[in-house]
Curated annotation (Swiss-Prot):
Name of this protein: Movement protein
Domain of life: Viruses
Source species: Tomato aspermy virus
A biological-process GO annotation: transport of virus in host, cell to cell
One cellular-component annotation, GO: host cell plasmodesma
Chain's role: Transports viral genome to neighboring plant cells directly through plasmosdesmata, without any budding. The movement protein allows efficient cell to cell propagation, by bypassing the host cell wall barrier. Acts by forming a tubular structure at the host plasmodesmata, enlarging it enough to allow free passage of virion capsids.
Length: 277
């Protein structure tokens, strides 16, 4: 006979484990820490030459194993209709480049099921980003719920896969990927409509273009260079001198009605970074 019952919350459906036990599995200090350290949830992952392929499960193995036992216990006691499912409504990744835009390279990002030995992209949801396309935001939508089961001693789980291609001559970090998602667990599974991976290119923020005039630019320079900070000696220049010269040029331009003030003065052989990027 099929299981019949009302739709209730997870803790209401089972008495196999106490509410405190379930809460500890999901929200303990260790569980939260491992979501960051093992899964990189909400953290910036650097793509380097020595880490060309990154596979990150969306749930730490320890948490997955504890949840699997929790569901199995309730199922075997006849209190849960299944051994548990994990669902992830959406995975959102913010990708930025950390090398010059003319560097030849790309990233390939997709979701995979660790229960698949080939780790093929789920429903062909793959996003390829050339270095010149960055920054960008990409999103993925799994089209099924992942059963909470063990395969060869490893808990089955969705995983985010990031592959770095090209970037010849760039051995350091070429891109930063910050990913966010919210896994959900239930004794009942969901049905999904097919969905394609999303990709949105992001225009770099031009802070200087939003300033109203020379005085605003001067205030920005002052806040960035911070006259009260200790003097930092560079080859041939000091930050304080650069700031004063920049202000003089801005004042001169302000006195000229047809002068352009929306671009940074080019007075040094080396560029001055004023926007913090």
């Amino acid at each position: 006979m099929a299981f019949s019952g009302t739709s209730r919350t997870l803790t209401q459906q089972s008495s196999a484990a106490s509410t405190d036990e379930l809460h500890n599995i999901l929200f303990s200090r260790r569980a939260i820490q491992e979501m960051a350290t093992k899964c990189d949830l909400g953290r910036h992952h650097w793509m380097r030459a020595d880490n060309a392929v990154c596979v990150r499960p969306l749930v730490p193995e320890t948490t997955s194993n504890l949840l699997t036992r929790w569901f199995v216990s309730g199922y075997e006691a006849g209190e849960l209709p299944s051994k548990g499912y994990m669902s992830v409504p959406q995975v959102l990744c913010a990708v930025t480049r950390t090398v010059t835009s003319d560097a030849e390279g790309s990233l390939r990002i997709y979701l995979a099921d660790l229960g698949d030995k080939e780790r093929a992209p789920i429903d062909a949801q793959v996003v390829s980003l050339h270095n010149r396309d960055l920054p960008a935001i990409v999103s993925f939508h799994p089209t099924y719920d992942c059963p909470m089961e063990q395969l060869n001693g490893v808990g089955r789980c969705f995983a985010l896969v990031i592959e770095r291609c090209g970037y010849i001559g760039h051995n350091g970090t070429t891109a930063s990927v910050c990913s966010n998602w919210q896994p959900k667990f239930s004794s009942k599974n969901n049905n999904y409509k097919p969905a394609a991976a999303g990709k949105t290119l992001v225009l770099p923020y031009d802070r200087l273009s939003e300033l109203s005039g020379p005085s605003a630019v001067a205030r920005l320079l002052k806040s960035q260079l911070n006259m009260s900070a200790s003097r930092i000696q560079l080859p041939g220049y000091v930050f304080n001198v650069r700031y004063v010269v920049s202000l003089r040029i801005l004042r001169n331009r302000q006195s000229q009605p047809n002068a352009r003030v929306d671009s940074e003065p080019q007075v040094f052989s080396k560029p001055v970074v004023v926007n913090g990027i």
